[in-house]
Amino acid sequence: MNPINLVQLLFFLSVLLVLSWPLGLYAARVYQGQPCVMDKILGPLERLLYRISGVDASREMDWKIYALVMLGLNAFGMVFVYVLERLQGGLPLNPLHLPGVDPFVAVNTAVSFATNTNWQAYAGESTMSILTQMLGLAVQNFLSAATGMAVAVALIRGLARRETTHLGNFWQDLTRSVLYILLPLSFVLALLLVWQGVPQTFTGQVEADWLDPAPHVAESISPDTPSTDQPPAKQTIVLGPVASQVAIKQLGTNGGGYFNVNSAHPLENPTPLTNLLEMLAILLIPAALCHTFGVMIGDRRQGLAILAAMTILFAGFAALTLAAESVPNPTLSGIGVPAVPSLEGKEVRFGTAGSALWAAATTAASNGSVNAMHDSFSPLGGMWPMLLMQLGEVVYGGVGSGLYGMLVFAVVTVFVAGLMVGRTPEYCGKKIEPFETKMAALVILIPPFLCLAGTALAAVIGPADAVSNPGPHGFSQMLYAFSSMGNNNGSAFAGLTATSPFWTIAGAVAMFVSRYWLIVPVLALAGSLAGKKRLAQGPGTLPTHGGIFVALLIIVVLVVGALTFVPALALGPIAEQLALFQ
């Protein structure tokens, strides 16, 4: 990796960490019901929403009711989006007169957006109407992100409270996440994107003159036979309320693009400045929630330890991705091609560094938006983002889900440390006993099972024409797909055709299970911890805010998360990389 790339990485991380600190403190005040700067503006609206919906925000819930209410809201969201997709052909705000969405794709999309995955088995600009994009997909971008934040806050309360069954009120946590955090940040980011040229309009499309006076003229079959193909007189450019959807798709670590090529499209991400702003938006809330955790638990050092582990892991994987994409393809050596970094599948306005750093950020978080085609990365350049997903989306991770995922790994870390010293493990003053260990094991083991079992199933019975490349890279496409869907990321090796019934239904099942079969054990863990006494730290207690704990946590994440996938990675990207040197 050259020094310029290193400077970019360090600058990005510095800005991210500086911005995350005040946001994390602000979020802690929001969730603790303390006065904050937005109270005068949003307080009356919050109370009005409670009155209209009949919610008693002062009534707290135990973990079972919290989980039941959360599941009910998300189930309703899935059904609503599915119906909206199927009926969009007869609904307003459809200037391109797009028909209803295929039922298999509609199911996949409804589950995808409700689970914060945003896997897209469709081309946004040619499949979804403006109404579907706004009322269906954008609304789920807010609600799915707020759901993850609410669950994370419930787990924090479980660690902070003592001898109680109450974890808070889901409706209040959801509402405050949207009103006080997601909406203001999205509004500011959308304005910045509009300033940089991202459209925000209800106009369906516009026609424009070609810059090239004679584009796309087909070549003649023979020099003596002139071509009869005529270039179109105008080019058609699809528009829509793009800026508002891009803002929440990044801030909520959703990732679903308004256009088919996502943030590689010049109307979603037109300049290097928007590229930086959107990358910061992807990781901002996940990083900030670490500070929120420290404040709410009463020991800011605990949050800093979690943030340090996340940042060290991200910096390492980002550096590896940058290094892999900064070297020329070995197969081009010796044939007169200049030894320059590969720009295949990348936008020139972002270059290799901007594309590789985005790839690391979008897969570290459960975001999945792309500004370059990961399928065109070098074998190792594509493997490191894939491995970031396979770690369980805990390296910053999704909004809320990244924090509660890393806290689960922290529980496993103190359990392992307790085994080594022969005493009952503790975390934040709470004893970690068999029930907590079982819930943590469920959360950690389900995503790898979904990834590996889904890939095996696709290799055996999946449609053969879905894979565009034979050999190791074709296997990598399938492994990447289920690693993405099984960890609620949503990015893809785009050479995979994922519109068949097998891929849409299998993907929907993987996304559903990896979201809710993890959230329920996390809430059960929170409920169990909330009922425990908080113990004073003794001489044999492992400090969970120091460098030793951070190092142990990183090792546990790498050993438990990464080693699970070594055999599969050996069949895919590693084999492909070795083949380049033959």
Swiss-Prot record:
The keyword Disulfide bond does not apply. Part of the high-affinity ATP-driven potassium transport (or Kdp) system, which catalyzes the hydrolysis of ATP coupled with the electrogenic transport of potassium into the cytoplasm. This subunit binds the periplasmic potassium ions and delivers the ions to the membrane domain of KdpB through an intramembrane tunnel. It holds the Pfam family KdpA. It comes from Solidesulfovibrio magneticus (strain ATCC 700980 / DSM 13731 / RS-1). One of its GO terms (molecular function) is potassium ion binding. The system is composed of three essential subunits: KdpA, KdpB and KdpC. Belongs to the KdpA family. One of its GO terms (cellular component) is plasma membrane. It is a multi-pass membrane protein. Keywords: Cell inner membrane, Cell membrane, Ion transport, Membrane, Potassium, Potassium transport, Transmembrane, Transmembrane helix, Transport. It is found in: Cell inner membrane. It comes from the Bacteria. The chain crosses the membrane at residues 6-26, 65-85, 87-107, 136-156, 178-198, 277-297, 304-324, 402-422, 441-461, 505-525, 546-566. This is Potassium-transporting ATPase potassium-binding subunit.
